[in-house]
C-alpha cells in the first residue's frame, strides 16, 4: 500500500500513527467493558484486534526504514539549493558586468561615430599645418607665452616652427632614419644640414641661415644679467634696437653697415653676439604707405643743412631789425 501510494512519507506515517492509536483505544475499551463492548457483540474477538495492531505496527516499521533515504535526498536537495543560490549570485554579477559592458560599448560606438564624422569633415576641408601653428601662436601670445629672447623686430624668421621644419623633423623622417646608416648624435648628425628653405631667403638675394641636427638654436649661451633694453650684459643696445628706439620701423630687408666697405651682413637672432657696436649703422628704411622720396640719407642731411641755414638767416635778420629799432629810439630821445 505504501509502495503504490503517491502520497508523501510524512502523510503515510501520520496516517499509520492515527490508525495505531485508534486500535490501541479499541483494545483497551474491549478489555475494560467486555459485556458492553460493541466489537464483541458483532463477532469480533480481541485476538483479531491484536493481529490488526501487529499489521499496522509492521507497516509503520516499513515506513520508518525509508526515512534515511528521504533524509539523504533532503540533504542533497538543500545542497543543490545552496549551489543554485551561489550560481544565481554569479549570474547576477555577470549580468551587471554585461550591462556595464553594453553601456561602455554603446558610448564607445557613439564617440567613434563622432570621430569618424569629424575625420570625414577634416578630409573634406583640409587645413595647412603652418596656418594652424600661426593661429596657435596668436592664441598663445595672449597667455604669457613669449618669443625667444634673441628675436627682434624685423627678423624674417618666425618665433614658431614652420611647415618645412616639421617635414625635416625626426617624426616624419623616422622610417628614413631607421633604414639609413646609424649616426652618432652630436657628431656626424651635426655636420649634415637639415633645413634649406628658399622661402626664408631675404628680398636682397641673401640666403637664410642653415640649421643642423644636433646644434642648438643659440650658438653661444648668453652671459651677464638680462635687460629688456640692452639684452645680456651689453652696455648699449644693438643697432637694430637703437633704430627701433628712435622710432624706425624696419622691414624684412637686411641691415647694412657702412663700416665694412658696403658689404651686407645677414644676421639671425639665433646668431646674435651681445657686443656694443663701434659705430652706429646707417639704416635704409622702406615704410609701406608713405610716398617714395628721391635720394637717400645724404639728401635728407642736405635738407637739414638748408633748414639750418634758413634758421641762421632768420636769426640774423631779427638781430638787424633790433639794432635799427634801437637806433631810432636813440635819435628820438636826442
Swiss-Prot record:
Residues 194-206, 251-282 have a biased composition (Polar residues). GO terms for molecular function: transcription coregulator activity. Keywords: Activator, Coiled coil, Nucleus, Transcription, Transcription regulation. GO terms for biological process: regulation of transcription by RNA polymerase II. Pfam families: Med4 (PF10018). Component of the Mediator complex, a coactivator involved in the regulated transcription of nearly all RNA polymerase II-dependent genes. Mediator functions as a bridge to convey information from gene-specific regulatory proteins to the basal RNA polymerase II transcription machinery. Mediator is recruited to promoters by direct interactions with regulatory proteins and serves as a scaffold for the assembly of a functional preinitiation complex with RNA polymerase II and the general transcription factors. Component of the Mediator complex. PANTHER family: MEDIATOR OF RNA POLYMERASE II TRANSCRIPTION SUBUNIT 4. This is Mediator of RNA polymerase II transcription subunit 4. It comes from Caenorhabditis elegans.
Amino acid at each position: 500500500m505504501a509502495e503504490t501510494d503517491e502520497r508523501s512519507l510524512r502523510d503515510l506515517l501520520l496516517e499509520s500513527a492515527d490508525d495505531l492509536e485508534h486500535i490501541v483505544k479499541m483494545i483497551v475499551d474491549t478489555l475494560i467493558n467486555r459485556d458492553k463492548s460493541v466489537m464483541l457483540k458483532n463477532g469480533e474477538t480481541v485476538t483479531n484486534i491484536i493481529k490488526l495492531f501487529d499489521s499496522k505496527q509492521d507497516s509503520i516499521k516499513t515506513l520508518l526504514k525509508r526515512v534515511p533515504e528521504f533524509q539523504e535526498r533532503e540533504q542533497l536537495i538543500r545542497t543543490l539549493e545552496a549551489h543554485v543560490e551561489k550560481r544565481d549570485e554569479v549570474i547576477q554579477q555577470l549580468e551587471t558586468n554585461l550591462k556595464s559592458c553594453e553601456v561602455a560599448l554603446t558610448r564607445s560606438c557613439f564617440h567613434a561615430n563622432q570621430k569618424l564624422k569629424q575625420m570625414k569633415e577634416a578630409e573634406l576641408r583640409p587645413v595647412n599645418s603652418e596656418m594652424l601653428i600661426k593661429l596657435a601662436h596668436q592664441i598663445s601670445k595672449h597667455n604669457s607665452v613669449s618669443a625667444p629672447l634673441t628675436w627682434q623686430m624685423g627678423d624674417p624668421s618666425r618665433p614658431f616652427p614652420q611647415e618645412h621644419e616639421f617635414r625635416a623633423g625626426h617624426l616624419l623622417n623616422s622610417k628614413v632614419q631607421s633604414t639609413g646608416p646609424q649616426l652618432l648624435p652630436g657628431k656626424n648628425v651635426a655636420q649634415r644640414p637639415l633645413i634649406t628653405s628658399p622661402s626664408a631667403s631675404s628680398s636682397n638675394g641673401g640666403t637664410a641661415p642653415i640649421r643642423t641636427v644636433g646644434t642648438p638654436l643659440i650658438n653661444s649661451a648668453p652671459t651677464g644679467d638680462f635687460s629688456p633694453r640692452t639684452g645680456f650684459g651689453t652696455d648699449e643696445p644693438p643697432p637694430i634696437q637703437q633704430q627701433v628706439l628712435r622710432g624706425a620701423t624696419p622691414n624684412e630687408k637686411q641691415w647694412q653697415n657702412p663700416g665694412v666697405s658696403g658689404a651686407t651682413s645677414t644676421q639671425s637672432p639665433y646668431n646674435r653676439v651681445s657686443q656694443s657696436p663701434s659705430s652706429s649703422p646707417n639704416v635704409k628704411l622702406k615704410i609701406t604707405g608713405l610716398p617714395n622720396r628721391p635720394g637717400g640719407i645724404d639728401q635728407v642731411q642736405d635738407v637739414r643743412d638748408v633748414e639750418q641755414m634758413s634758421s641762421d638767416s632768420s636769426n640774423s635778420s631779427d638781430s638787424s631789425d633790433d639794432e635799427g629799432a634801437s637806433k631810432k629810439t636813440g635819435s628820438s630821445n636826442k
